[in-house]
């Protein structure tokens, strides 16, 4: 992975191992949620794990992504409660990019995850 080529909204395969406990691990898709200034200048990125296990409990921090879109072969869920900082060297293949509408959904789910104003995806 070449530094400086990562953009907010990009989806990459990333190696998230090793993990502890309930963290998402292995080589899996991740969504880059860090701002582009950080993406350009930092050796790390902030990313959210993506799973194809669509039978998981539906949370207001989950965003559904249809298989066949943005480089994902299966229906998947972006897990905005599973956000972590990773070194860019963990990034592998670039898969695709979310559109503006999808990123607005992501931003709302992040607000829910972090308890920020505007997070209104079903949480009280």
Region locations from a protein language model:
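Conserved functional hotspots at enzyme active or ligand-binding sites that engage polyanionic ligands
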Residues: 1-124
């Amino acid at each position: 992975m070449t530094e400086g080529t990562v953009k907010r909204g990009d989806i990459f395969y990333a190696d998230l191992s090793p993990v502890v406990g309930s963290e998402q691990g292995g080589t899996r898709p991740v969504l880059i949620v860090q701002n582009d200034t950080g993406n350009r200048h930092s050796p790390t990125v902030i990313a959210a794990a993506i799973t194809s296990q669509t039978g998981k409990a539906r949370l207001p921090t989950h965003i559904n992504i249809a298989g066949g879109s943005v480089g994902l072969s299966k229906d998947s869920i972006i897990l905005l409660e599973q956000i972590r900082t990773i070194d860019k060297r963990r990034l592998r293949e670039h898969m695709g990019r979310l559109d503006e509408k999808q990123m607005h959904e992501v931003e709302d789910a992040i607000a829910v995850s972090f308890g920020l104003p505007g997070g209104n995806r079903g949480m009280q």
